Amino acid sequence: SPAVQEKAAWPELVGKTPEEARAQILLDKPNANVVVLEHHD
């Protein structure tokens, strides 16, 4: 049987707040090291 690939991208989080995005990533991948970077337009 094929190995289950760990989730590594969250395109659905575009437009969310950093807090919302971080919470969702940690739900999907509890061992993730989530780093929030500032974005300047």
Curated annotation (Swiss-Prot):
Transmembrane segments: none annotated. Disulfide bonds: none annotated. InterPro entries: Prot_inh_pot1, Prot_inh_pot1_sf. GO terms for molecular function: serine-type endopeptidase inhibitor activity. Pfam families: potato_inhibit (PF00280). The keyword Transferase does not apply. GO terms for biological process: response to wounding. SUPFAM superfamilies: CI-2 family of serine protease inhibitors. The keyword Acetylation does not apply. Gene3D superfamilies: Trypsin Inhibitor V, subunit A. It comes from the Eukaryota. Keywords: Protease inhibitor, Serine protease inhibitor. Belongs to the protease inhibitor I13 (potato type I serine protease inhibitor) family. Inhibits chymotrypsin. This is Chymotrypsin inhibitor. It comes from Eisenia hortensis.
